[in-house]
């Protein structure tokens, strides 16, 4: 008679899982409501929540309240310094380059207090949920074997070295800037000392420290999930929270597409195509298709668990409905990249998951699959009949016409300029966060980017090719940690393609599609996208490492 292995016994959710899960849920709920990486205090608040999640995954209950006291002290010191800086100053503010007049976007109080107050909220939340009096004995062993953990630390150390060894300083006022050379150690990686935060006239400040803040919050969320050892059911619950948040945001964003006014205090540019709180529809489309991929993975998870009862209904149908709705809203953002991704998810990834992931259970889940397909077709026909895809069709036609006329896409000149910039410093790069300050010299040489007088028409702040821009900023040496993380991901991708991981295969494909999309657009500099991406990567790792196939093999005959 079969005897169940010990790891096949369902145990209660631990208090540490509750603590880290609560902070992660808060980050996922708040993620889409900040204007990406533009508003400094939103980025700082995300990083604060991420740090509190790591402490919740590592420390005991007493440690949470001790760290809460640290965050209170930090907030008091920051408030005192801000008040002192504002008193009688011609250019008030805690941080450099603060404009004389404030809006919500660049308010010095928000910027000074966002990180400690967000960390305080996360720590108090962890203190309420956590019941373990001592530090976790498993956190360090888990992180010690985590390639993304070490890759993130190595990348942060490299960027810090660049910033400490600055070859120049950016002096900026009212959209004009120049780089003042500085003495530095020539044989070490060098960076550019530039504004950390934005003012009213130019919301495009960026440097290495700000880049680390943008990447650091989502990275800390992933580290916390791994250190706490969150099991699949907790990650499934977080995925449901993210999908539900995205669905609510999709409806609200579709109904709120202003062409003027402000978002978090920043004036909406005249040429911007806003969707909700996203200044760019492409970013909204990416956020929605990431959650559509999560919903597809949830449908696969619940379908496998339902087995031959799938035709009777269940959460898999709700998840499939959510995936279709989010995919349609992603298309309604008029993002060509989002349309291609959701099309591949539906027409390629979903069938591949059925035939590859359910190889041993295909007969059991077939009735449930047909029920989901019929429901999906009905949803697509119903929503497609009332939705207006005319703007999307016009945009696609315009891009196709420009490609036929020029023989290339409209962002090819930016890629060419970025490539020349990267080749001038291929080993160490120009410094993290330096692209917008250095690249205009190279952009000005591209005929397609010039005006009628042969001058640069508009300065591009990003290359719209994230991997090429990263190469230009950090060089080949700075890409080594990224390559290590990609090797780790390759192993997870290979594991996801094995039989018994139907819920992991959509996540792996989603990450591949996101990486390809980042080769043609600006994606990896926005915290809402990276926060969801951190959950996708953590879920992929858990689904491949905590497989049902492996647990079934552990059952003794």
Protein language model regions, located:
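Extracytoplasmic loops and strand-loop junctions of Gram-negative outer membrane beta-barrel proteins
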Residues: 137-138, 206-207, 310-311, 399-404
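Membrane-helix interface linkers and caps
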Residues: 130-145
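Alpha-helical transmembrane segments of multi-pass inner-membrane proteins
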Residues: 2-59, 64-88, 107-131, 147-169, ...
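Interfacial juxtamembrane loops and adjacent helix segments
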Residues: 167-203, 261-275, 394-410, 416, ...
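Perimembrane loop-to-helix junctions flanking transmembrane segments
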Residues: 93-103
């Amino acid at each position: 008679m079969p005897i169940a292995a010990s790891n096949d016994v369902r145990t209660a959710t631990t208090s540490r899982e509750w603590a880290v899960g609560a902070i992660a849920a808060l980050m996922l709920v708040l993620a889409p409501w900040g204007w990406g990486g533009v508003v400094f205090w939103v980025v700082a608040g995300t990083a604060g929540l991420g740090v509190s999640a790591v402490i919740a995954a590592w420390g005991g209950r007493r440690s949470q309240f001790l760290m809460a006291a640290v965050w209170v002290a930090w907030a008091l010191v920051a408030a005192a310094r801000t008040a002192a800086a504002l008193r009688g100053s011609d250019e008030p503010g805690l941080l450099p380059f603060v404009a004389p007049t404030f809006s919500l976007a660049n308010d010095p109080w928000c910027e000074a207090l966002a990180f400690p107050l967000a960390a305080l909220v996360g720590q108090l939340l962890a203190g309420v949920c956590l019941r373990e009096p001592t530090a976790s004995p498993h956190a360090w062993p888990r992180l010690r074997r985590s390639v993304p953990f070490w890759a993130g630390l190595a990348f942060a150390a490299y960027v810090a070295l660049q910033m400490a060894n600055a070859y120049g300083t950016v002096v900026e006022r009212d959209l004009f800037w120049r780089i003042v050379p500085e003495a530095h150690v020539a044989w070490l990686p060098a960076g550019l000392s530039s504004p950390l935060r934005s003012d009213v006239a130019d919301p495009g400040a960026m440097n290495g420290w700000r880049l680390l803040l943008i990447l650091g919050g989502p990275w800390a969320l992933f580290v916390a999930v791994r250190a706490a050892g969150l099991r699949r059911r907790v990650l499934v619950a977080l995925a449901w929270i993210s999908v539900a948040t995205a669905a609510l945001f999709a409806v609200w964003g579709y109904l709120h597409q202003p062409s003027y006014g402000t978002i978090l205090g920043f004036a909406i540019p005249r040429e911007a195509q806003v969707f909700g709180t996203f200044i760019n529809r492409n970013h909204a489309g990416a956020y929605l298709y990431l959650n559509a991929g999560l919903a597809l993975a949830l449908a696969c998870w619940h379908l496998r668990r339902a087995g031959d009862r799938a035709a009777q209904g269940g959460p898999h149908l709700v998840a499939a409905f959510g995936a279709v709705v989010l995919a349609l809203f992603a298309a309604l953002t008029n993002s060509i990249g989002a349309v291609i991704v959701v099309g591949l998810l539906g027409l390629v990834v979903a069938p591949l998951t059925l035939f590859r992931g359910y190889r041993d259970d295909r007969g059991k889940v077939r009735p449930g699959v047909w029920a989901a397909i019929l429901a999906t077709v009905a949803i697509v026909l119903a929503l497609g009949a009332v939705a207006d895809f005319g703007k999307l069709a016009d945009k696609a036609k315009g891009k196709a016409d420009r490609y036929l006329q020029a023989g290339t896409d409209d962002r090819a000149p930016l890629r060419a300029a970025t490539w020349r910039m990267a080749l001038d410093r291929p080993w160490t790069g120009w410094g993290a966060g330096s692209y917008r300050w250095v690249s205009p010299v190279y952009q000005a040489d591209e005929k397609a980017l010039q005006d009628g007088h042969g001058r640069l028409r508009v300065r591009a702040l990003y290359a719209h090719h994230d991997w090429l821009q990263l190469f230009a900023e950090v060089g080949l040496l700075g890409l080594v940690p990224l390559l290590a993380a990609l090797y780790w991901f390759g192993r997870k991708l290979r594991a996801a393609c094995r039989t018994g991981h139907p819920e992991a295969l959509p996540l792996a494909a989603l990450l591949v599609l996101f990486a390809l999309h980042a080769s043609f657009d600006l994606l990896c500099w926005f915290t809402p996208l990276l926060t969801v991406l951190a959950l996708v990567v953590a879920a992929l790792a858990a689904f491949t490492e905590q497989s049902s196939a492996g647990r079934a093999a552990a059952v003794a005959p």
